[in-house]
Swiss-Prot record:
Known role: Required for biogenesis of the 60S ribosomal subunit.
Database matches in PROSITE patterns: BRIX
A GO MF label: rRNA primary transcript binding
GO cellular component terms attached to this protein's record: nucleolus
Gene Ontology biological-process entries: ribosomal large subunit assembly; rRNA processing
Boundaries of every Brix domain copy: 75-268
Superkingdom of source: Eukaryota
InterPro entries for the chain: Brix, BRX1
Pfam families the record matches: Brix
Organism name: Dictyostelium discoideum
The name this protein goes by in its record: Ribosome biogenesis protein BRX1 homolog
Compositional bias of kind Basic and acidic residues: 1-17
Recorded family membership: Belongs to the BRX1 family.
Region (Disordered): 1-66
Length: 326
């Protein structure tokens, strides 16, 4: 038998209300602090994400710049010449090699008919551009500038050449320094001049960060277009004492380039431009010989006319002159 006291205890336990868990109410300051901390965490996370994105973009840009610079700093210009080059043009080539630090010299070419083989030589020597001094008959020098192997190629006839040793100018520049390139306004007037300007810029401009180059500019390569010819000059940038302006002092060398033809490929291909005002040195020599021959013919003709006039003007002696001879 269950005691009634135990039954009453069970009934009381069932009827008693269950005590609810006590929840501590947070104060307004604690709520504000929690909200502020959450906002700060969100801001920090956003800033960290933005920084990560910026770092990734910078790394991408650095990699792209490294690729571009690696391609640009590997730019090389191959210098070569044909057999029979004279001392004057050989010294000119040596001067240009000393002024262009990203240049590379190659042996002479035996056969002029196989100029397209220079493209293979450039590929073997890992050169992007080529300059050829093609001397014919010991006096005529043709300068070929080419972007190998796809082109274009520009052929010039060089005249009025003066080397550094010949000029002995007061200007001077450090070997390996980078040059400024200055072009006349007339280079933007015609299409073929714009092409020549771009090719000269790519060949003569020293790439930034090149191994053999110095990280500053102290001379200027100037190209002027006048009388259908390109005039080349090299000046030193020297600062005058007690003056803000800079002074240009000529260094040398000097040369005048007459445009002959522009080809589509490297040392060959179709002719993109042919200068109608260009006269080859062979034609000038033949004209000079013809003028000399014409002078000789005129002199002989005048001599024959003089003899005829003398015969006509000759007066035979009269009988009066011989009266007193007996």
């Amino acid at each position: 038998m269950v005691k009634p006291s135990k039954i009453l205890e069970k009934i009381k336990k069932r009827t008693e209300p269950v005590a609810e868990p006590v929840v501590e109410e947070e104060s307004d300051e604690e709520i504000i602090e929690q909200e502020g901390s959450e906002e700060e965490e969100e801001i920090v996370e956003e800033e960290s994400e933005e920084e990560e994105e910026e770092v990734e973009e910078e790394n991408k840009n650095i990699e792209e710049n490294k690729k571009d610079q690696s391609i640009y700093t590997k730019k090389r210009v191959l210098f070569t010449s044909t057999r029979g080059i004279g001392s004057k043009y050989r010294h000119l080539m040596a001067d240009l090699i000393s002024l262009i630090p990203h240049s590379k010299k190659e042996d002479k070419i035996d056969d002029r008919k196989t100029l397209s083989l220079i493209n293979e030589t450039c590929e073997m020597k890992s050169c992007n551009y080529a300059i050829l001094f093609d001397v014919r008959k010991g006096t005529d020098c043709f300068l070929w500038m080419a972007k190998t192997p796809l082109g274009p190629t520009v052929k010039f006839h060089i005249t009025n050449v003066h080397t550094l040793d010949e000029l002995q100018m007061t200007g001077n520049c450090l070997k390996g320094s980078r040059p400024f390139l200055h072009f006349d306004k007339s280079f933007d007037s015609e299409v073929h001049l714009q092409l020549i300007k771009e090719l000269i810029t790519q060949i003569y401009s020293t790439p930034k960060g090149h191994v053999k180059s110095k990280p500053f500019f102290d001379h200027v390569f100037s190209f002027f277009y006048q009388d259908g010819r390109i005039w080349f000059r090299n000046y030193q940038i020297s600062d005058q004492e007690f003056k803000k302006d800079s002074l240009l002092t000529e260094i040398g060398p000097r040369m005048i380039m007459h445009i002959d033809k522009i080809f589509s490929d490297g040392f060959g291909g179709s002719v993109l431009y042919s200068n109608p005002n260009y006269v080859s040195p062979n034609n000038t020599r033949s004209d000079h010989k013809l003028s000399k021959a014409n002078k000789y013919i005129k002199r002989k003709y005048q001599k024959g006319k003089a003899e005829e006039r003398q015969k006509i003007s000759f007066i035979e002696p009269s009988e009066v002159d011989t009266v007193f001879d007996n």
